[in-house]
């Protein structure tokens, strides 16, 4: 099994390489559209996850205009959900950070100079040089800003990646073949059942947290965990009885949760 994350910048050629890798390994490609489709399986409405479309302009503004913590939890839930299969090519969405502790994932960064990226956009999208420069500048600012906001890390930090490919030196086909060959190594291809089970539990936990945040629940004094599929356990404290009641109501509205275990106390006089 091959689980690969690919991080790219607009115009770097990363999407082409990702498609070739997925086709060469005969595994699924999880781009924006596919991740949104997977979100539906978690009972996440399309309009909720569409806010995280990395290709659409205004990414950072869209997140800040909503409930940012809730949407970050949704993003994590979807990434963990698709990763539990142990194979696939995931494009962006912080997947290199979310899966950094899973040894079975190969994290790849596709790099190209700004001048090469500008020329690629001019040729591929028939843009003027000024338009291409503006589009790349805006895309870079939004992606870097979002990543820093979500993870407090620099998107360009080389320590986040197992492999960095410069597409000015290595063509798309050669890059794809190199990734395919590397993913076949024993260290990368062996993904334990324990790791896959952990991803599924983390996906369920993040989905529950996102639902609670959407319902204006303060998670500061709450601990959410998913010991097994369909089960959620919440321990901690709420400021009011109303907040505690809203937690129960929110969880009961989640059809995928069949066993809700709680030990929630109401603080006397608030926090």
Predicted regions mapped to residue ranges:
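Glycine-rich phosphate-binding P-loop
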Residues: 5-19
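Short beta-strand-centered segment that lines the nucleotide-binding/catalytic pocket of NTP-utilizing
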Residues: 28-40
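ATP-dependent small-molecule kinase phosphotransfer cores
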Residues: 38-87, 127
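ATP-dependent NMP and nucleoside kinases share a basic, alpha-helical "lid"
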Residues: 88-124
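N-terminal targeting leaders
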Residues: 101, 112, 119-124, 146-160, ...
């Amino acid at each position: 099994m091959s689980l690969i994350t690919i991080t790219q910048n607009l115009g770097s050629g990363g999407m082409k390489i990702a498609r070739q890798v997925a086709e060469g390994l005969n595994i699924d490609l999880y781009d924006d559209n596919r991740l949104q489709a997977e979100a539906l399986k978690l009972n996440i409405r399309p309009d909720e996850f569409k806010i995280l479309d990395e290709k659409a302009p205004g990414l950072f503004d869209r997140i800040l205009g909503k409930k940012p913590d809730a949407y970050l939890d949704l993003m994590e839930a979807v990434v963990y959900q698709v990763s539990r299969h142990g194979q696939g090519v995931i494009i962006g969405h912080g997947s290199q950070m979310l899966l950094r502790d899973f040894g079975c994932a190969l994290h790849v960064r596709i790099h190209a100079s700004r001048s090469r990226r500008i020329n690629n956009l001019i040729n591929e999208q028939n843009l003027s040089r000024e338009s291409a420069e503006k589009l790349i500048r805006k895309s870079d600012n939004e992606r870097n800003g979002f990543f820093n906001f979500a993870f407090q890390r620099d998107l360009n930090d080389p320590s986040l990646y197992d492999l960095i490919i410069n597409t000015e030196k290595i063509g798309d086909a050669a890059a794809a073949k190199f990734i395919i060959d590397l993913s076949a190594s024993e260290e990368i291809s062996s993904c334990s059942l324990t790791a896959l089970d952990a991803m599924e539990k983390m996906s369920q936990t993040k989905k529950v947290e996102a639902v609670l945040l959407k319902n204006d629940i303060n998670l500061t004094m709450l601990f959410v965990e998913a010991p097994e599929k369909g089960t959620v356990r919440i321990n901690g404290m709420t400021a009011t009885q109303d907040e505690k009641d809203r937690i129960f109501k929110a969880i009961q509205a989640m059809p995928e949760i069949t066993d809700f275990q709680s030990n929630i106390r109401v603080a006397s006089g608030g926090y």
